[in-house]
């Protein structure tokens, strides 16, 4: 199985952080591609995990979301307020250390999107 296929399989299951992290950080898979796969499978947790890891292809992601008739995801990706989560180490390759690091992980960018949705909704984006 090639790396992109492995990444695609990893992104099918929502909240599959350990496998996505390992594919992107340890094996060198493209984090933006992981975000695109997650958009295709409508896995919001994975989408925001990818953003936390540094995915930044928001325009392409919005286009893909619209193609998949996912206006909610496209609206979330339209917010211009996301950034990489510096608390996630991008150098760790030991699966046990990664597992411990991600044990209590909560996406800072998903929290931002959630607060925006609660306060303003996504209709005006």
From Swiss-Prot:
<keyword id="KW-1105">Inhibition of host STAT1 by virus</keyword>
<dbReference type="GO" id="GO:0039502">
    <property type="term" value="P:symbiont-mediated suppression of host type I interferon-mediated signaling pathway"/>
</dbReference>
<dbReference type="Pfam" id="PF01671">
    <property type="entry name" value="ASFV_360"/>
</dbReference>
<keyword id="KW-0899">Viral immunoevasion</keyword>
<dbReference type="GO" id="GO:0042330">
    <property type="term" value="P:taxis"/>
</dbReference>
<dbReference type="GO" id="GO:0039563">
    <property type="term" value="P:symbiont-mediated suppression of host JAK-STAT cascade via inhibition of STAT1 activity"/>
</dbReference>
<keyword id="KW-1114">Inhibition of host interferon signaling pathway by virus</keyword>
<comment type="subunit">
    <text>Interacts with host STAT1; this interaction mediates STAT1 degradation through apoptosis. Interacts with host STAT2; this interaction mediates STAT2 degradation through the proteasome.</text>
</comment>
<keyword id="KW-1090">Inhibition of host innate immune response by virus</keyword>
<keyword id="KW-1035">Host cytoplasm</keyword>
<protein>
    <recommendedName>
        <fullName>Protein MGF 360-9L</fullName>
    </recommendedName>
</protein>
<comment type="similarity">
    <text>Belongs to the asfivirus MGF 360 family.</text>
</comment>
<keyword id="KW-0945">Host-virus interaction</keyword>
<keyword id="KW-0244">Early protein</keyword>
<dbReference type="GO" id="GO:0030430">
    <property type="term" value="C:host cell cytoplasm"/>
</dbReference>
<keyword id="KW-0922">Interferon antiviral system evasion</keyword>
<dbReference type="GO" id="GO:0052170">
    <property type="term" value="P:symbiont-mediated suppression of host innate immune response"/>
</dbReference>
<dbReference type="GO" id="GO:0039564">
    <property type="term" value="P:symbiont-mediated suppression of host JAK-STAT cascade via inhibition of STAT2 activity"/>
</dbReference>
<comment type="function">
    <text>Plays a role in virus cell tropism, and may be required for efficient virus replication in macrophages. In addition, inhibits IFN-beta-induced IFN-stimulated genes (ISGs) transcription. Mechanistically, degrades host STAT1 and STAT2 through apoptosis and ubiquitin-proteasome pathways respectively.</text>
</comment>
<dbReference type="InterPro" id="IPR002595">
    <property type="entry name" value="ASFV_MGF360"/>
</dbReference>
<keyword id="KW-1106">Inhibition of host STAT2 by virus</keyword>
